[in-house]
């Protein structure tokens, strides 16, 4: 408030740019998840148009591990960011 000690207010353009960057990151993460889990869990030669039980289970586990890893990496990055933030030196 009044520029004293608070977060600076972002302009509409800055908010839009931040939202676009976040959308790009989420889209990239989704595409990597699909690509990695597809390569790991689904044979290159399809015998059936539907996923079989093994493929479905593999994909479920792959996606769960991918998100769990993403959360852990995010938490570690946040801790590192706080440790090296200005005023900590």
UniProtKB/Swiss-Prot annotation:
SUPFAM superfamilies: Tim10-like. Disulfide bonds join 37-62, 41-58. InterPro entries: Tim10-like (IPR004217), Tim10-like_dom_sf (IPR035427). It holds the Pfam family zf-Tim10_DDP. Keywords: Chaperone, Disulfide bond, Membrane, Metal-binding, Mitochondrion, Mitochondrion inner membrane, Protein transport, Translocation, Transport, Zinc. The keyword Membrane applies. A motif (Twin CX3C motif) lies at residues 37-62. Its main location: mitochondrion. It is found in: Mitochondrion inner membrane. Mitochondrial intermembrane chaperone that participates in the import and insertion of multi-pass transmembrane proteins into the mitochondrial inner membrane. Also required for the transfer of beta-barrel precursors from the TOM complex to the sorting and assembly machinery (SAM complex) of the outer membrane. Acts as a chaperone-like protein that protects the hydrophobic precursors from aggregation and guide them through the mitochondrial intermembrane space. Heterohexamer; composed of 3 copies of TIM9 and 3 copies of TIM10, named soluble 70 kDa complex. Associates directly with the TIM22 complex, whose core is composed of TIM22 and TIM54. Interacts with the transmembrane regions of multi-pass transmembrane proteins in transit. The twin CX3C motif contains 4 conserved Cys residues that form 2 disulfide bonds in the mitochondrial intermembrane space. However, during the transit of TIM10 from cytoplasm into mitochondrion, the Cys residues probably coordinate zinc, thereby preventing folding and allowing its transfer across mitochondrial outer membrane. PANTHER family: MITOCHONDRIAL IMPORT INNER MEMBRANE TRANSLOCASE SUBUNIT TIM10. This is Mitochondrial import inner membrane translocase subunit TIM10.
């Amino acid at each position: 408030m009044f520029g004293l000690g608070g977060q600076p207010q972002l302009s509409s353009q800055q908010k839009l740019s931040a939202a676009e960057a976040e959308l790009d990151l989420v889209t990239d993460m989704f595409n990597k998840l699909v690509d990695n889990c597809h390569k790991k869990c689904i044979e290159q030669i399809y015998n059936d148009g539907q996923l079989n039980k093994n493929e479905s289970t593999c994909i479920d586990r792959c996606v769960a591990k991918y998100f769990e890893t993403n959360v852990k990496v995010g938490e570690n990055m946040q801790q590192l960011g706080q440790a090296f933030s200005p005023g900590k030196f």
